[in-house]
Amino acid sequence: MSATKLTRREQRAQAQHFIDTLEGTAFPNSKRIYITGSQPDIRIPMREIQLSPTLIGGGKDNPQYEENEAIPVYDTSGPYGDPDVAINVQQGLAKLRQPWIEARADSEELTDRSSAYTKERLADDGLDELRFTGLLTPKRAKAGKCVTQLHYARQGIVTPEMEFIAIRENMGRERIRGDVLRQQHPGVGFGARLPENITPEFVRDEVAAGRAIIPANINHPESEPMIIGRNFLVKVNANIGNSAVTSSIEEEVEKLVWSTRWGADTVMDLSTGRYIHETREWILRNSPVPIGTVPIYQALEKVNGIAEDLTWEAFRDTLLEQAEQGVDYFTIHAGVLLRYVPMTAKRLTGIVSRGGSIMAKWCLSHHQENFLYEHFREICEICAAYDVSLSLGDGLRPGSIQDANDEAQFAELHTLGELTKIAWEYDVQVMIEGPGHVPMQMIRRNMTEELEHCHEAPFYTLGPLTTDIAPGYDHFTSGIGAAMIGWFGCAMLCYVTPKEHLGLPNKEDVKQGLITYKIAAHAADLAKGHPGAQIRDNAMSKARFEFRWEDQFNLALDPFTARAYHDETLPQESGKVAHFCSMCGPKFCSMKISQEVRDYAAAQTIEVGMADMSENFRAKGGEIYLRKEEA
C-alpha cells in the first residue's frame, strides 16, 4: 500500500506517462513464442519460461549439468507481452481477425452509424481531443446472413478462431518431453468431458452444443480468440471502468493493459461516468482480449440517471452503439421479472446488483414487465448481426451469506434458462451469470441448478464470496468460492479485488484480484484434470527441490513478488544459489535433508548391490567367463 496518496492530477499524469512509454515487455527470463496453425496468419502467442540447468554431479572445477525444458504457458497479454512489437496506443492494435472476417464474405461495412447517440458524439467537435483517431468503419451481417461463431459451428464449419483456440488451450504441452513434468493426478470433473488433446473439431462441437462460447464481435478484429466453457481452461474476467467521481480515459487504458499483463482472459468496462463512449473506443482498439459491458449503465446515463425514465428505444440505441464499436458480450438483466421482485423483500441485503436494482425499480414504478424480457428477441437479432455474445445477468444474486440460494435467486436462474433457448434460436452465444455470496456447503447446488436449468450453457460467477466478515480481503473470501465452483464446472470467474464493497479499484488492486483468481482458476483446472495443467506445478516443485531460486521466481504467477519476499531476508546474490531459505536456515531445511537422505540411500544401494555381485561371483567359482547354463 502506497504511503502517499496521489492527487487526481498526479494519477492522470502517471497514467499518461505509462501510455506514452508503453512497450512490449516479457516477464523475467521469458520469451514470446508463436505456434503456427494450418495457415500463416493463425499464430498463437504463448509465453515460454526459460529454466536453468540442474547440477547433477562433478566437482567444483568440472560441474556436470542436466538441461531443464522451457515451460510454455497461456498468455493473455497480446502484443503487450512481445518486446518485438512496437506499441502505439494512439493507433491501436493490429487487426488480427480482419482477414478471417473478410474471407467469410457474410458481413458488410455500414455507410452510417445505426445509433443516434453515436452520430451525436461524432458530430460534437468539442470531443475531438478525447476521441480515438483511427475509428473503424463498423460492419454488420449482410441481409439474410448470420455471423456468429455458434452459427458457423452448427453448420459444421471450423473457423480460424476455433483452430486458434484449440492450439491455445493445449498450452504447447506437446513441446514437453520429460516424464517428470508430464505426470498428472487424475481429476474429478463432475461430468466435464476433457479430451487428452483439444482439436479444432472439439472446439466447434462444444460451441455448437452451446456448452462454450467464443466472444468475438466482428467489429473487434484486434482480439485474440478465446473460449469460455467448462470443458476448457477456467477463465478469469477483470472489471475496469470509470465513475462519476474517479478515473480517466488514460487510467482505464492503463488498467486494460495491466489486466491483460496479469492474466485477464476478458475485461468488462463498467464505466458509469463521463465520456463512456470515448473511453470504450480507446479500450476496444487497444484490447487483445474480449470486452464486455453492462449496457443498462450507459442507457441510464442517457436519461440522467433516472431509472423510471428508461425506455426500450434508449436501450436499443445503446446496444447498437456498443455493438458497432466492437463490444464482445453484453450483460443483460432480462431475468429480473416483476413477479420476482417481492421475493427479495425478506432478504437481509435486498437487491445488490446495480443492473438488477435498476430494472426492479423500473418494473415497480411502471408496474410493467421488464422491457429487456419483453424485447429479448429483438436483443437477439441485434447480437446475431454483429456476433455479440449474451451474458445473462443475475440481477437477483444474493448480496450476503444469509440470502444465498433463496427463492428469488433460483427463480431468476430458471428464467435465464428459458432465455438461453430463445437466444439459441437466433444462433446467439450465451453464458449465464451467477452469485455472489454463498457459504461453501451451498456452492455446488448453484452449479447443478445452472447445468440443469440453463442447458449446460457456460456459467460465469462473481466469486462467490464464502464469508461476509472480511472487507479489504474479499479477494480471499471470494477466491475460495471461485476455486470450488470452478472445479464443479464454472467456466469463467469474475475477479474480486481487495476494494470490493469499499471503493473503485486502482492498478495494484487489479493485480491483486487477478493473481488471486488465476490461482483459483488454476487450482480448479488441476482438480478437474485438465490435460497439461500440472506441468508448471511439476516444474516449480523440481526447481524448489533443486534450490534453483531464479527458476522458482520465474515460474511463479507473480515473479516480482516472489523475488522480493525472498530478498527481504537473503538479498545477496549468494542467496540465489543457497540450498536453504531464511525460514529453516542451512541446518534444518527439509528439502536439503531429503536430498542428503536420497544421496545416502543411493550410495547404500550401490554398496549393497556391489557386495551382492561380489558374493555371487565367488559362489560361481571366481571365473571371468561362465558356461551359458551357469550364467
Swiss-Prot record:
EC number: 4.1.99.17
BP term (GO), one: thiamine diphosphate biosynthetic process
Binding site for Zn(2+): H437, H501
Keywords annotated in UniProt: 4Fe-4S, Iron, Iron-sulfur, Lyase, Metal-binding, S-adenosyl-L-methionine, Thiamine biosynthesis, Zinc
UniProt binding sites for [4Fe-4S] cluster: C581, C584, C589
Cofactor(s) listed: [4Fe-4S] cluster
Binding site for substrate: N239, M268, Y297, H333, S353, R354, G355, D394, G395, L396, R397, E433, Y460
Family assignment from sequence similarity: Belongs to the ThiC family.
Name this protein carries in UniProt: Phosphomethylpyrimidine synthase
Lineage: Bacteria, Pseudomonadati, Pseudomonadota, Gammaproteobacteria, Enterobacterales
